[in-house]
Every structure is written in C-alpha cells, then in structure tokens.
Amino acid sequence: MFVVGQRWISESENNLGLGIVTASDNRTVTIQFPAAEEERIYALSVAPLTRVQFQKGDRINSVEGWQLDVEEVVENQGFIIYLGKRADSGEEAVLPEMQLDHKVSFSKPQDRLFSAQIDRSDRFALRYRALQHQQAQFQSPLRGMRGIRASLIPHQLHIAKEVGQRVAPRVLLADEVGLGKTIEAGMILQQQLFSGRVERVLVLVPESLQHQWLVEMLRRFNLKFSLFDEERCADFDKADEDGNDVSENPFDSEALVIASIDWLESSPNRAKQVLASNWDMLIVDEAHHLEWSENEPSVGYQFVERLSKQTSAVLLLTATPEQLGQESHFARLALLDADRFYDYNSFVAEQKDYKPVADAVATLLNDKPLSNDEQNSIADLLSEKDTEPMFKVINSEKSKENDRLQVRQELIRELIDRHGTSRVLFRNTRQGVKGFPHRVYHQITLEMPSQYTNALKVMGMMGGVTKDDQLYPERLFQRMNPAAKWADFDPRIEWLITFLKNHRDEKILVICKQADTAIALEQILREREAIRSAVFHEKMSIVERDRASAYFAQMEEGAQVLISSSIGSEGRNFQFASNLVLFNLPDNPDLLEQSIGRLDRIGQKNDIQIHVPCFENSMQMILATWYHQGLNAFEETCPMGAALFREFGEELEIFLKNPQAVGFDEFLAKTFKRQQHLKAELEQGRDRLLELNSNGGEAAQALAEAIAKEDNNPHLVNFALSLFDVIGLEQEDLGEQSIVISPTGHMLVPDFPGIAEDGTTVTFDRQLALMREDVEFLTWDHPMIRNGIDLITSGYIGKSAISLLINKNLPAGTLLLEAIYMVETQAPKGLNLTRFLPPTPVRILLDNKGNDMAAQVSFAGLEKQLKPLNKQMANKIAKMAQADIKKLIGISEQKIAAKLPELIEKASQDADSTLSAELHRLTSLQAVNKNIRSDEIEALEQQRIESLKQIALANWRLDSLRVIVSNKE
C-alpha cells in the first residue's frame, strides 16, 4: 500500500504540508513533512493519511517554484507522474510526485458538499468560532501563563513572561523558599512548549523532590512527565545472541523526563545515555548542591556543565543566595554563560563595583536625596547619559513630587538594564514580597512510654540503634513486636485526639515520616473517635490523593484533618489550613522547611501554628530545640539552615546520641550566634536593584489583573459547552461553578483526552480549582480545550453545510455562499510565527451576483436568521445548484487572493517591528551590559530574517463553506 517516495497528507494535521513516505513495514509507515521539518510514524491500521493524486485540469506547483497544468496522470509501480504544460512558458513538462511542492495544503469542502457529505449548520458555526478562538489564542500575550492552577502572583508572572518569551533562555531562578520557583520554571517551560521552541525537556532534581516535581507539573500545568530510575532504564538494556550490547537509549523514549541527579552521579553509564540524548531544555532544581572549586569541581557539576553546553535552554533553580558561597554562585552563572563568566576574580571585582549602585537604588526607592558618592556611582555606570539634571530634580526640595517620581523611576530603569547579572539572575525575597503570615511554634513535651524505652535499650545492647530508631521509636517497636500495636500506648495519639477535639472548626495538617504511620493514625481517628479525616501518602495513586485533598478542602462536610506522609505531601499546598502538626520531626532543616511550606505560602490568610509533640530527654527533643533556639527554623524561613547543618552537624550528633550530655545550652548559643551573623550578612548583601528587576513592579501587577479578567471568560464557557455537546459528551451541572463531563456511546471520537470513564469534574473558576485538586481548571490553555479545538479544526466537522435563510426581503431561492478561508504559513514551529500570522480565518459572504457582504452582515447576525435543512433536501440543493456554487467559489478565490497581500503586509510589519525592537534593545544594552549574549542577538537576527521570509510565503486555502438558500418562511 505504501511505497517509499509516495506523497500523502495527514488528515489530522493539515498544516504539516505534503508528506513523503520514507519507510514502511508490516506495522508502521514513516512520513517526512519537509515544509514543517517534522516526521511522524503511524500505525498502518489507523493512519490518518490520504494519498495525494491530482487530476487532469489541476494546476500544481513544483518544489522548484514553477507550475504545471496537468493534462495526463500516469502511474508506474506505485508512483505518480504528471504530464502537462508549464504555466510560465507553455512548454511540455514532466513532474514526478517526488518533485511536488512540499507546501501544498489539501482541504476541499466543495468535494464533500457535492458528494453528499453535508454537515449540520451549527457545526459549521462551531468550526468557524473554533478557528477564531484558535487565532486569538495564538496571538494572546497571556498564553502559557493563564492556565496554571495557582494564585496569580505578580512577581512569578513577571519572571515567567520576561524569561518565557526569550529565544533559548538561560537563567538562574533564586527566589527565597516559598516564593514559587517551581511555578516560575513551569510557566517558562509552558510558554516555550506552546511556541514550539522546546519539545524535549530534562528535569534534574534531588531524589527527595522527584515526586514533588512530577505532581506539580501534572496538577498545575497538565504536563505529563515521566520519572526515570534504574528500574525503568533496565528494561531497555538488551544483548544479541552473541552477547553484544544492542541496548536502546531509554532517555529517547519520552519527551518530558524527570531524573534524580544523585542517581546519575552514581551511575556513569546512565549519565552517558542522558548526554547522548538530545534535549531542548534542561531544568536543574536545588542547583546549589552543584559544588565547585577552581581545582576540584564535583561530579554533579561536571555532568551538568556538559549537559548545559549541548542544551540551548537552561533553567537553574536555587534558594541559596550567593553570599553563602560566592565561588559556587559564580560557577552556577558560568553554567549559563561560560563566555561571560570566565574568571572568578574578575567576577568578584565586578560585583563589588555594583554594591555602591545597589545602595544608591535603596536611597532612590526611599525618596531621599542622593549623596555625592551615590551620584558618582550612578554617573560612572551611566557614563553615556547626562545625569546631572536628573540629580538636581531628585535632590531639590523645590521639585514637584511627581517630577521626582518620574526621574527616580527612569534612573532605576536605566540601572536595572545595566545591572551585572539582572538578565540571567532573578531573586525575590520575603522582605520584598508582601503577603506572608507569621509562624508560631508550640512544643509539646510528653513522657516517653516504657515500651519505647525498653525497645531502644534492647536494640542498644544488640549494638544496632540507628538515628531513625531514636527519632521514630514507633517503627522500632513495631519491628520488634509485630503482634502488638504502638498506637495503643503512644501518648502523642491521646494528645492529638484532644487537640483535634479542641479545634473542631479548624483544618489541621498532620505530617508523619512514613506512610504506615499515617495510615495507622487516620484509622484510629476515624474508627475510634469518629473524627472526619483523610490520609495522604506515596502508596496512593495521584487520583486517590486528589480525592483525599478535595475531601480535606471542603469547608462544611470535608475532613477536619489530613494525615500525610512526608513524601506524600510533596508538591501539595494547603494554605486554607493554618495548623500544622509534625507528628514526626524531619531530620534536616531543608525537609523541615518543606513541611512548613505546605502551609506557609503566599495566600495564607492566618498565622501558622506549628505543633511538635516530642518525648522528654529524647533525640526528638534535642533536634526540635536546636531547630528552634539554634536556627529559629520554626518561626522564620532559614535559608542558611543547610549550611549550618553541615557546619555544626558533627557536634549536634553528640547531643542527639546523648541528650543528657553537658554543654548543650552553650552549643545552642553558638549556633544561634552564627545564624544571626549569616542572617545579617544576607540582609546587608541584599541587592535591591536585582530584587526590583525580579519583582516586576506595576507591570507585574497589571499582568496578574489581565489574567484574572480572563478567568471565567463567558466566550470560553459558551464555546466549551458547545464543543462538549458536538463531541457527544454528557454534561451535568453540579452547581458551585462545576460541571461533570462524561463520555457517551455516541461520541465523535472513541476516547477524548482528559475525560475519565466515570466522568471528569471541571470548573472555569480559579479559586474553586485551587481548593479542589480533583477538579480540572479549564482555560484556553487547558489540553481539553486545545485538543477540542484541534479535533474540530483539523477534521471534517462543519466543513460543508447548507442552511435556509428566512428573509421576506429576498426572493425565494436566492443563493448565498459563505466561505471561510484560512491564511497561514507552513514554517518550522521554532520561529513561533503564530504570534504574527496565526492560522487566520477570513470570512467571505457572496450574494448570487458575487458581491462580498461579509462587512455588512455579521456572522452572529446571519446565524440568528438561519434554519436547518434535512439531509435529503440539502443534498438535492447541492446537486441542483452545483454550477452556481462552483462559480461563486471561483469568485471567492479571487476575493481572498486580493486580500492576501494586505494580511501578509500587516503580519510582516508586526514581525519586523517586534523583532527589530527587541534586537535594537539587546544591541544597545550589549554596549553597556556584558551579560547580553552575542549568540542571543545573532539568533534573534536570524529569526527576524527567516520570519519575514516565511511570512511572505503565506498562502490561503478554503477551509469550509456554507450554502445559504433564502425562503419567505
């Protein structure tokens, strides 16, 4: 059936152009689409492909640009050869199908009309609206940011927009913990995916954060990443009969991959496979663990360095400021731009030069006069500007307040553009971002039960007491006494029950170390005390966790308490609760902050009450006291926690193993003194200029407001409900702004993506979606809406229709033709030309004399006057009026051909204006800021040239048509 070299088109992806068969076997066929620089592999049984065969009388284009008027079609061994005359010279010519223009597009609604494949008029209307919405969404500046299941936080949106719209972004996201670096990275990634600049993404994280990333990417962005570990990769290891390695690269099997950097550091073979796979974007979380020194970079650093050199887009995430390790900070920046950050000493000197400028900015922000030193620092940096008049306005008491404000803002903008690392480094601090609650610590001291004391004593005599045994004695006891139940005597349970009863009207999150502990606790609360509770752990599926989360989120009939394992809660935030019980204490400061971070988020309305029940004179008590009095980690975020843990870890271990040891108070005082010293260093080293650039100011606030206006958009709601109806999905309104969408037996497609067998609950309301993770949040960016639009626009739904127009002013039987043409380019996705010329529907409405009335008669206005026709009558009209319809189609082609140059000109102007402005801005900045990469400017210039070239090649095709016949009644 398929022969290498034959030409086929994709029925589901018309925009790919004309394909060439490059390979075929018993099960699959491979098609190359040169126009779009894409390749597809189809299963033979369900390949959505149509053989391309032109007929006598057709005019066809060659790949060399000349046209042939076909006079004869010859087939030879599966290949087609076209014979005819060249349109330009009239000479006889031969055109084998291999030489056909790759940019041919096929979609002939007239063929369907005349072959009795006539659709309902309301489906034609839905198709046109889908095309209009598709065009609008391609051009929306909010695309890739509005669909996130998260609150609209201005600084996050600012960073996402600033970075997400760059070509090959390479940045360091260094917001303090709790400010949403993962969300920023996700929005940047989403924009890059939507624009087509990125397809294959690798996320490297510490092992403990793998599930958090997996869950956050799915629940917040609808991105289905795959988790790669040794077990998964082992399935790809193969050897032939002779024992030769014929393994496939496992990392080539998925486009979106999450892997543990710890695992890859310890597995050179897997690291080699990662390097052998081609990635478009690399994201590294907890990048401060990549240790570097000039003479001895760590294995992890060297691995990421090699990856970053062969990957165009790189995002590094770290919460550790450079003051805790200037060398490592320099090394992370070098991963992003080795040419710019090539010498550590030069970097240190340059950073020192910016310190006085940052101080001057603080003065500007506080609306105070600038000192002479501050004026000199600013003048040195803005050497090409005459700053003297600006200083006079700022320092003069006679200046109007509004004038001072304008000059201050202009100066700050100029300084931001010249900041040494402001283009590659973004950092927001809690001091700079308002809206965080206080944290209040409550330590509950309980007597350790004799059962635990005895178990620890016996295990100690056997020489096998571990740190985990002492921190979590319930697990040790259960291991030694499988028939008994630790929950029958543990005083923490009685305390928890009493606490819950005293706070019946409050939501409480309880975090345990292990899933088994969480399961046992929840069972006791539910069965013994009839307390409404839910459990949440890593052994549950994501759907089960969503349901538990939704039950906890319900205000009236929901669970009072959610009991979660520490791993189970990763990636979940419950800011509607303000009480946290740490049933088991995390064993390092980072994990402690992660646990508190489940509640301590922007949007938390109340102070967070942190309750820690622990046994007297135990390892738990020592650790809790050190966290509180040494690090102050319960009541404040502690960015230096990990560094202090490393610095004092060995000494802490002495007191953990022997809680009675002398000198603990002195140790606490020493830790706290060091913590205060580092905290002061951090505060002193705060770069106000960098924070200002990272914050986004009023523009970021305006961006958040613009997205908020799109939430619950009535156009989206109406379109989505019509879409679900046409697809054949059942809709049940649940009230409270949610709907259940369920599959039926009469759907257009057997399996619509995103719809579960038992139905899926959806909402258009962001706040409800934040409360209920089991509810899908529908926006224009959601896969359900995007897939629905693709289903309508790329298939045959609504391509041809015939309707009755009830109008007493027109003679009965008057024929009108409504033609929808698409103007589009067939260019590589990476150019992101849809910003300037998306697939654009152009409506032409012809009367029986060929006059275009589209401007006078609106689509919506006409739609109200139309009545449906039964299929038999529609077919009869199509046959009777075939000649007139063909004549009107010919006239409509002349009309669209006349409109095309204007559309191309406007798109070219938009592209040239946008890309030239960005090019000019970067070129100007490069003269005063070394951080502007030359390769970025070169790529942008190349993009501008190629974009204008491809837009000039835009063409039109007839997408759909509706024949309208008038009647008096």
Curated annotation (Swiss-Prot):
Chain span(s) of sequence motif DEAH box: 285-288
Any one Gene Ontology BP term: regulation of DNA-templated transcription
GO molecular function, one term: hydrolase activity, acting on acid anhydrides
Keyword Cell inner membrane found: no
Broad class of enzyme this protein falls into: hydrolase
Keywords per UniProt: Activator, ATP-binding, DNA-binding, Helicase, Hydrolase, Nucleotide-binding, Transcription, Transcription regulation
Residues the record lists as binding ATP: 175-182
Coiled-coil intervals: none
Domain annotation Helicase ATP-binding: ranges: 162-339
Functional summary from the UniProt entry: Transcription regulator that activates transcription by stimulating RNA polymerase (RNAP) recycling in case of stress conditions such as supercoiled DNA or high salt concentrations. Probably acts by releasing the RNAP, when it is trapped or immobilized on tightly supercoiled DNA. Does not activate transcription on linear DNA. Probably not involved in DNA repair.
Protein name, as recorded: RNA polymerase-associated protein RapA
Provenance organism: Actinobacillus pleuropneumoniae serotype 3 (strain JL03)
